[in-house]
Amino acid sequence: NLGPALLAGGKVAFTSNRNGFAPPKGYTSPTLQLFVMDEDGSNVTQIAPMNVSSALHPTPLADGRILFSSHESQGLRDARMWGVCAIWPDGRRWEPIVSAFHDGQAFHFATQLSDGDVVVEDYYNLNNNGFGAFFRLPLRPPPGEPRFFSAFPEDNPAIDQTVGAGFPYPFTMPFTPRGFRAITPFTTPNDEAAPVGAGGVRVGKVTHPSAAPGGDLLLAWTPGPANDLNRPQPTPYYDSGIYLMPDGGPVTSPSQLVLLKNDPAYNEAWPRAVVKYRDVHGVDEPVELPWLPNDGTVHPSLPAGTAYGLVGTSSFYKRESFPGHVTSWSDFFDGLDSFNT
């Protein structure tokens, strides 16, 4: 049982491998799934049976939803990819917040700032040891606009980063959320050493974003390459400390971070503001969303205690092989369509 998070109404969300499942594609094991229970440990309920691969770190949102990282290895995707989703505490209204589309990409570790924006981390899933770059986004798009840009990368806005060679190299990805922007553009989430900064010193990478009062952001930052491989070098090794990013960023250099604690004898991580929820979010607790009663009153065909049912149609209207095009290395349809092969 991992990652407990306090919800409104005396509930606690957490992840657990108690079902003993293994991910369909392996690589990330075991399968952790989302559960909610009362704060005294009673009424344990699995709320996300769609977590057949894995889920991590539920985080309460002020509007009552739960933010969490979801292992996204479906279909033809790379087995290391994680996205960030939201769900109601009773398991309804599961929806994407930001999805991964680059090989080895993990959107993981998230928090909600005082103004309602969310900060997520992007890192390469393996050699970066959880260190990468931060991105900020609103939970709702501007009025009258869709939440996400196009499925085609070239129709998406450029996102700032600085690559290991030390120069800016913005990237694009499909379905970029509206308002998605870098708040640590001085570094990169990629599988390479952090960029060289002033005086030939590598600028390092960040991890573990956590909201603080007044719109500030706590984080862990390490100088150096923050990558295990010789790309071009792995040393000096990690020396993580706790820092504060004023106003939730952006910052264009690690020198703009405010040092809180960095003992060279230790790696400090997982900062948390030890304050009341109101001090960060302006309310005493998140909205308490209604719980699906499941008491037999919704429909005669659904008696009390009816098991969850999942309905999925995305593979029909937005499948990975668009009509008339199949990725060259995965063309196994012999001239037929993916649904009549």
Range-by-range predicted roles:
Residues 203, 276-340:
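Surface beta-strand/loop "capping" patches
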Residues 236, 240-243, 248-289:
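Blade-level signature of beta-propeller repeat domains, shared across WD40, Kelch, NHL, RCC1
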Residues 1-2, 8, 15-34, 48-55, ...:
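A flexible loop/linker signature enriched in serine peptidases of the S9 family
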Residues 1, 44-45, 94, 98-102, ...:
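Surface-exposed loop and turn segments in beta-propeller and other repeat-based domains
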Residues 72, 91, 110-115, 122, ...:
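Carbohydrate-active catalytic/glycan-binding domains of CAZyme proteins
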Residues 12-17, 66-71, 117-122, 217-221, ...:
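Residue position within the beta-strands of beta-propeller blades
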Residues 1-11, 52-67, 102-117, 156-161, ...:
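Conserved beta-propeller blade repeats
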Residues 200-249:
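Extracellular low-complexity, Gly/Ser/Thr-rich intrinsically disordered linkers
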